[in-house]
C-alpha cells in the first residue's frame, strides 16, 4: 500500500466570525464548536488514518505561531507558512511538492481545517475508502456531502454511474463540478438526487495530481516546477517560497483541475458534516435556553428570543427585549448584527481595511 499523508489547509481568515476571528487568530484557531481549536480537532480526527509525522498544515506567516500552538504534537517542519495566499490550486501544488519530497509515489488528502464532524469513526472509515479509491486507479477523488437543502453557498458535484463499491461504500463517477448556483438552480439540483455539496475534501496520488496540473494548469505547473527547483537549490522551503510562491497563478483547485478533469470520482459522505460558515450556524451545535437563545461565555437574555450571545474573558454581556440577533463581545471589538444580515460582516471588514485608524481591528 502506498504511503499516505494528510495536508490540512489552515490559511483562511474566517471573516464571518469577526470579531473573534482576526488576522492572527482566524476561525480555525478558535473553539467555535467544541473545547479545542477547530484545527486541533481536524488534526486529531486524521490521527487514526495516517501517522502523526505524515500530517502537514499549510497556513500563513501571521498564523504560523498560532497553528504551532494548536498542533503541539506535529513536527514543527510539518507546519508550513505560505508567504501570501494564492488560492487552493497553489496550496494543492505546494502540498504536492511537500509530499513528493517525502515519497514521490505517496497518496495524500487535502482537507479544510475548520469543519465540524462529530462521527469521527465513520469519518475515518470514509476517508480510508477515499484513499483506497485513489490507489485503485489513476483517479482524482473527492468526498461529497448530501445536501440538507438548496444552499446557494456551496459548489455542487453531479454524480454519474457507479464506479465500484469499496468496503460497503458506493464510489460514483463524477459528471461535473458546478459553481455556487442561484436558489432556483439549487432547488433543481436537489430534485434530481444526483448532486452533492462540494466540501473541498480531496484525495489523490502524487503522480496523478501532478499529471493533472501538467495537463490542465500549465502556467501553474511551470511555477511549481520553479518552486521545486528553488527549494532544492537553496536546501529549504523558506527562501524558495518567498521568491516564487507570490508569482503563482491565483486560482481555485476546482477551476484549475477538477472542472477540467474526466478521471474524477466522488465518495458520498456517510458522516455528519457542517462547515459552520457564519455565526448563525453555531446555533444547531448548542442547547438553547427555553426561549431559543444560545449563550456562550458570561451572557444573558431578558425578554428576547432566538438570539446568539457570545462573550469573552468573563465580561457579562446582557441583551433585553430583542430577538434574532447575534451579539459577540471581545476585549477589542463588539458586534451586534441581525441574523439575516450576518453575511454583511465581510462588507464591514472591507470598510475597516480602508480606514487607517480602524485597520487594527481586523
Identify the residue ranges that each predicted region occupies:
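Short coil/turn connectors at secondary-structure junctions
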Residues: 2-5, 52-53, 75-76, 103-106, ...
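Left-handed beta-helix
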Residues: 2-3, 206-362
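Conserved core of the sugar-phosphate nucleotidyltransferase
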Residues: 120-245, 265, 339
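Alpha-helical scaffold segments in soluble metabolic enzymes
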Residues: 28, 41, 45, 66, ...
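Conserved N-terminal catalytic core of the sugar/cofactor nucleotidyltransferase
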Residues: 1-8, 15-26, 31-128, 132, ...
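A short acidic, often aromatic-flanked loop/helix-cap motif at beta-alpha or helix-coil junctions
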Residues: 85-90, 149-151, 183-185, 273-274
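Fold-independent oxyanion-binding glycine-rich loops
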Residues: 11, 60-61, 83, 111-113, ...
